[in-house]
Amino acid sequence: MNEEKKVKYGEIYFYDFGEHEGSIQNGLRPAVVIQDNKLNGHGPTTIIAAITSVTKKLYLPSHILIGEQFGLTKPSMILLEQVACVNQKDLGNFVGAINNEKIKRAIRCGLKKTFGLWDYAPRGDADVRCLCPKCLQDYIHSNKYIVKRLDPFAA
């Protein structure tokens, strides 16, 4: 990457994440810039999130499906739990840029949930519960509860 150019939020570049054990993303893969443009413009580093073509666990708020667009050649998903601070000059070839406001909003919302910045406080006296897909089935088919919203993480 040209050292003079500053990256922007939502841009996708190839980045070599190196070799790791376990579930940490490895190797050369696309990554999206998730750091604010003001910070990108004032420093040599940025924060990126890995992108994978293995689209699973879509119910997690940290997994943002972006499909086969923005320069990507396969249906892909952003992994907001797989972030790294990197030198801007170490980013590889430019792939594309996320220009869809709904996806950008989903990324911001997912980052808040991933880093524990989301307020889950119930409003009023209502009994508010956040359920995994498996537990949700018990509530949907019960006469004791009223399920008002099935997807509280929808952007």
Question: What are these model-derived regions, one by one?
Answer:
Residues 3-6, 34-50, 113-116, 134-137:
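Short, charge-rich amphipathic segments
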Residues 23-28, 33-68:
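Compact nucleic-acid interaction/catalytic patches
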Residues 4-5, 69-129, 133, 137-155:
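C-terminal terminal-subdomain/extension
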Residues 18-22:
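Short, charged beta-turn/beta-strand-edge "cap" motif at the junction between a beta-strand
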